């Protein structure tokens, strides 16, 4: 493809490393980028960039398959998943594969199949990545114009956006079909402590689905993270899938309007920055979801949430002391508030003590004991079931607190188990990665805007001290 502008003019930031290390097309002289700038060398080589992306997808899918099989090989059915450091099998179990009542694993074969399918897929992607990176055409515009593009071709860019949106919409519908037709998904709220069930009565009311988006993100409200029934989750995927598919068709059929052409920067680096910004939002949202939500991330597989473990401890000692003769309705604690039960700011009966801060927790083992005004004293005296006691004792000793060296659990709880909860791992990793992606978004957005405006801030690369130093090799 003929270059329509001077590389020097377009790639504002040049950092000379050592031009003698590389071949033509891969060195600084011919691309304007040093070897470590990675895919920046491929900005105008659509064929090679395709290879890089397909190979990257292959690495991702290879990790998924290999890690999946690793978890299957190490899995012990007698222990809960969250005690074994698993992060992939809980996702498969949540989708209803291999589990039965109470989240008990009945069959690990579906997990094995999942791992093998991902490994085989990664081999196909890996071959495609190597082919396009090394053997295929450098640019696709001449031989395969449908797959070719120029970054500033606004119509082509929105067509590619549309194709991506349609694929995302189909992905959302995969969950819908699994929940509706292919065996159902795991519902932690099923009576008696959770079970796999088909979700038949979807929530499609726009006021409910979009009402989540309008909620406050703070305690008691919790934005979309507060979703607590599968009908809403699956119904939300119907809405999301439909919007993505319709939006994708719209973007394929239309050209950007004048206001959009003016508002956006239309370059490869700008698109990179938009994508990184979106992924940062996904990362932060996923962090909050896995930390607080025990419906999309059932506690049977991921362990209790922090508030859940705390409330479970209060419940466990209420049960114990009630058996020993305490009157849990009137016993006073050291601060003058109720020792076992007290009232929330809005008048509900809640657990007393330090766990009062988590009074708005909802959990399947606790909800049967609530009445119209919070915890029901008569139910606490007469209706507590053995499965509720067992589960709360288990969750009390598995709080999602823990450091990298696995000293987990509540420091003052002598029965706590030494482990790190998958909720801790997943929330921390998604927060940290989301933050890094956000910084990458700011970095690339700044560069893209500076390039579009025709200036850059930074040191003058022509007189950089390193240029007068001896090459490293």
Curated annotation (Swiss-Prot):
Chief location of this protein within or outside the cell: plastid
UniProt GO MF annotations: chlorophyll binding; electron transporter, transferring electrons within the cyclic electron transport pathway of photosynthesis activity; metal ion binding
One GO location term (cellular component): chloroplast thylakoid membrane
Record-listed N-acetylthreonine modification sites: 15
Domain of life: Eukaryota
SUPFAM superfamilies the record matches: Photosystem II antenna protein-like
Annotated signal peptide: none
Origin species: Ipomoea purpurea (Common morning glory)
Membrane-spanning parts: 69-93, 134-155, 178-200, 255-275, 291-312, 447-471
Assembly behavior: PSII is composed of 1 copy each of membrane proteins PsbA, PsbB, PsbC, PsbD, PsbE, PsbF, PsbH, PsbI, PsbJ, PsbK, PsbL, PsbM, PsbT, PsbX, PsbY, PsbZ, Psb30/Ycf12, at least 3 peripheral proteins of the oxygen-evolving complex and a large number of cofactors. It forms dimeric complexes.
Compartment(s): Plastid, Chloroplast thylakoid membrane
Cofactor, free-text remark: Binds multiple chlorophylls and provides some of the ligands for the Ca-4Mn-5O cluster of the oxygen-evolving complex. It may also provide a ligand for a Cl- that is required for oxygen evolution. PSII binds additional chlorophylls, carotenoids and specific lipids.
Protein name, entry field: Photosystem II CP43 reaction center protein
UniProt keyword list: Acetylation, Chlorophyll, Chloroplast, Chromophore, Manganese, Membrane, Metal-binding, Phosphoprotein, Photosynthesis, Photosystem II, Plastid, Thylakoid, Transmembrane, Transmembrane helix
Membrane topology classification: Multi-pass membrane protein
Pfam families (alphabetical): PSII (PF00421)
Family: Belongs to the PsbB/PsbC family. PsbC subfamily.
Alphabetized InterPro entries for the sequence: PS_antenna-like (IPR000932), PS_II_antenna-like_sf (IPR036001), PSII_PsbC (IPR005869), PSII_PsbC_sf (IPR044900)
Residues at which [CaMn4O5] cluster binds: 367
Modified residues (Phosphothreonine): 15
Propeptide span(s): 1-14
SS bond list: none
Biological processes, Gene Ontology terms: photosynthetic electron transport in photosystem II
Taxonomy of the source species: Eukaryota, Viridiplantae, Streptophyta, Embryophyta, Tracheophyta
Role summary: One of the components of the core complex of photosystem II (PSII). It binds chlorophyll and helps catalyze the primary light-induced photochemical processes of PSII. PSII is a light-driven water:plastoquinone oxidoreductase, using light energy to abstract electrons from H(2)O, generating O(2) and a proton gradient subsequently used for ATP formation.
